[in-house]
A protein has these predicted regions:
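A short His-aromatic
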Residues: 118-120
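C-terminal lobe and adjacent flexible extensions of AdoMet/dcAdoMet transferase-like proteins
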Residues: 211-256
């Protein structure tokens, strides 16, 4: 995660168009079902839901249809949130780095989708994120997120692909270093502006995390792991895992 320039400036509207992809729509549906199932199983009454690293809000806005729910969308990209605000004024949008997450409200549920947590490049910083999320949740609150595994980054290594998104084109190239465990994604966008195409380069880095690493971070931050699911399997190997965590209640003092 970088605190320098916004890598999505100039392409946020195109990223928003990608949400129309049928495969992505299936992911959104999967996450909604998993969270609602988890809420039902725990008998949780949700008043506030926080969607972290929400991008242009495609995973956030559908929750505004839930009666009695207050929805908060958090992202570090001002460009992404400008696009999100155009689509809904029923979400409380907040531009901030989730490593330093601060909210005035506490929530019963928090979500973070599309391997967004893989953008946090060190275990120390990801542990910090877990602490911050625990701080904004009520005891018994749920944290649902997904993580891409190393299998995914190894599979993507040195693969290139040309995508067509509406009238836009994007050439994607990927590199993964197993020693540093850092993946580099380079996206060259060609966006029509009148009679010409404007080129935009987006470069982001990600890092895989193991199930054992996530479990340890969860425990350290006061969570218990309720569910780990293989959300996506490629060539017989899990490439994306879905986690459901529950914030533990505070320990009661022992009476003599």
């Amino acid at each position: 995660m970088s605190e320098k320039r916004d890598p999505y400036e100039g392409v946020a509207d195109v990223y928003d168009q990608m949400a129309a992809d049928p495969e992505l729509q299936q992911f959104y549906l999967y996450w909604r079902r998993l969270l609602l199932q988890s809420i039902s199983e725990r008998g949780l009454k949700v008043r506030t839901l926080v969607d972290l690293m929400c991008g242009t809000g495609n995973s956030t806005i559908p929750w505004t249809r839930r009666a009695g729910w207050s929805i908060v969308g958090v992202d570090g990209s001002a460009a992404m949130l400008r696009q999100a605000r155009k689509k809904s004024d029923r979400v409380h949008w907040s531009c901030q780095d989730i490593r330093k997450l601060r909210l005035e409200v506490r929530a019963e549920a928090a979500t973070c989708h599309f391997d967004a947590l893989n953008h946090v490049l060190s275990p120390e910083e990801l542990q910090q994120v877990f602490h911050r999320v625990a701080d904004i949740l009520h005891p018994g609150g749920l944290f649902l997120f997904d993580i891409s595994t190393e299998n995914w980054f190894r599979w993507l290594h040195e693969r290139e692909k040309l995508y067509t998104i509406g009238k836009n084109y994007m050439m994607s190239s990927n590199r993964y270093d197993p020693k540093s465990r850092i993946a580099e994604f380079r996206q060259l966008w060609f966006i029509p502006r009148g009679r010409v195409y404007e080129k935009r380069l987006v470069q982001v880095r990600e890092r895989p995390y193991t199930t054992s690493e996530i479990r340890k971070m969860a425990r350290t931050s006061g969570f218990r792991v309720l569910t780990v699911k293989q959300q996506w399997v490629l060539e017989g190997k899990p490439v994306r895992l879905a986690f459901v965590l529950e914030k533990k209640p505070p320990r009661q003092p022992k009476h003599c």
